[in-house]
Amino acid sequence: MVQKILAVLMFAVMLTACGTENAEDNSISVSESAETTEDAVLTYEQISAEDAKKLMDTASDYIIVDARTTEEFAEGHIPNAILIPEYEIADRAPDELTDKDRLILVYCRSGRRSKIASQALVELGYTNVKEFGGIIDWPYDVVTD
């Protein structure tokens, strides 16, 4: 009987030792994961259509990027917007958006592509990117070509 109790105690000690080793390994992983997350913090700011309109009315130096397709842009876009489709941002932004600190307001149809385009701009080094969703939620004037 004493041997069985001793065997159970030894087994418990071994399990505890194994559990402690794994906990230490996990803490290292969590720490490394936190550092990775801190590096990925760079992002754009999401604002409402109303806030974007206020910036357009008050800011002196900004650019509006429409991240939709050429066809969608022709159907109607925000006045003074330039068309750079989301899938062309990486190729065209360096040539068309030369000041990386300039205020850039980005929109698309519903907000999905403008989020992708905005994050791509940030990853390219642009520092003042604001995404304001889609033109379907834009209650102000639009123009057509």
Language-model region placement:
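Structural scaffold elements adjacent to functional motifs in cytosolic proteins
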Residues: 63-66
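Residue-level signal for mature regions of secreted extracellular proteins and peptides
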Residues: 11-12
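Rhodanese-like catalytic fold shared by cysteine-dependent sulfurtransferases
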Residues: 2-6, 18-50, 55, 74-102, ...
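Short acidic/histidine-rich motifs immediately flanking catalytic phosphotransfer sites
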Residues: 60, 103
